[in-house]
């Protein structure tokens, strides 16, 4: 009976810990910056020194007349050129 009680307590503790994502506080900003630099999101720019219109994540589309300048998942939206892309990667 005592071992059953111990197992029940362990299961209850694990349930509480696993259901609360903030039990272990994580520095989300640091992780996002680290992931962005690893995926090349910070090194993808528009040609001609023109700034990008903003970053996007993989599932999003760029506005009309623009193309995605990206490496892997992160990137920027730049003006479309005659060649079809206006990105410096």
From Swiss-Prot:
Keyword Transcription annotated: no
Disulphide bridges, residue numbers: 44-77, 46-69, 62-78
Signal peptide stretch: 1-21
UniProt keyword list: Disulfide bond, Signal, Toxin
GO MF annotation list: toxin activity
Tissues where the protein occurs: Expressed in ectodermal gland cells.
Keyword Signal on entry: yes
Role this protein plays: Probable toxin.
Name the record gives this protein: N.vectensis toxin 7
Organism per entry: Nematostella vectensis (Starlet sea anemone)
């Amino acid at each position: 009976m005592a071992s059953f009680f111990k197992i029940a307590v362990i299961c209850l503790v694990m349930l509480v810990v696993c259901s609360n994502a903030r039990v272990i506080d994580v520095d989300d900003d640091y992780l996002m910056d680290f992931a962005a630099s690893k995926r090349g999101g910070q090194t993808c720019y528009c040609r001609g020194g023109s700034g990008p219109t903003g970053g996007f994540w993989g599932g999003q589309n760029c506005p009309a007349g623009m193309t995605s300048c990206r490496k892997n998942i992160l990137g920027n939206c730049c003006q479309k050129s005659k060649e079809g892309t206006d990105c410096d990667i």
